[in-house]
């Protein structure tokens, strides 16, 4: 499996992944297309590719010393195979290379699988945002400081 920067040829696969994994929270085709095309200069789209098939994607923004992980989504049949870990490690490396000293993200409070994944990767809860999502769900805000070994869980 390879993690690489997304290209315009990946837009349809990313949009499909958004719909499959994020449902009502999925981003529009236009927004994905704009981001992949580089028209959002602080936003980085990554894809995980296996045998020429997109099996996951990640989106992160980088502004000054803060990176925000906006998305990690993995196709159902490729979960628990290290895809999310590989995408996260690439985001952490990208953030560190861009001068970030921390990574923030939000995750639904009822998403136990994601909360467990991020905790295992060194993220800690720093806040909660009530009614953050369109359906009124609360978001848990997580943070990970970047330092030496940031791409390997440290």
PLM regions and their residue ranges:
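Structural motif
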Residues: 98, 116, 120-121
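Acetyl-CoA-dependent GNAT
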Residues: 5-9, 13-77, 81, 85-94, ...
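Short glycine/proline-centered loop/turn elements that form peptide/ligand docking sites
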Residues: 88, 111-114, 131-136
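Extreme N-terminal starter segment of soluble prokaryotic enzymes
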Residues: 1-3
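Alpha-helical segments flanking ligand/cofactor-binding loops in enzyme cores
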Residues: 12, 115-116
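Short amphipathic helical patch at the helix-1/turn junction of helix-turn-helix
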Residues: 74, 108-109
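Conserved catalytic-core motifs of GNAT/GCN5-like acyltransferases
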Residues: 104-106, 119, 124-141
């Amino acid at each position: 499996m390879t993690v690489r920067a997304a290209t315009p040829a990946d837009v349809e696969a990313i949009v499909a992944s958004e719909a499959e994994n994020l449902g009502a929270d999925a981003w529009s085709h236009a927004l994905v297309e704009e981001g992949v095309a580089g028209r959002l200069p602080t936003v980085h789209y990554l894809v995980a590719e296996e045998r020429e098939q997109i099996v996951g994607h990640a989106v992160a923004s980088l502004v000054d010393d803060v990176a925000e992980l906006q998305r990690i989504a993995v196709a159902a049949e490729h979960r628990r195979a290290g895809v999310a870990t590989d995408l996260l490690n690439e985001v952490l490396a990208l953030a560190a290379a861009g001068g970030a000293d921390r990574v923030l993200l939000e995750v639904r409070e009822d998403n136990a699988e994601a909360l467990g994944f991020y905790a295992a990767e060194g993220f800690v809860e720093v806040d909660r945002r009530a009614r953050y999502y369109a359906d009124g769900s609360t978001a848990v805000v997580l943070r990970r400081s970047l330092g030496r070994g940031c791409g390997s869980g440290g």
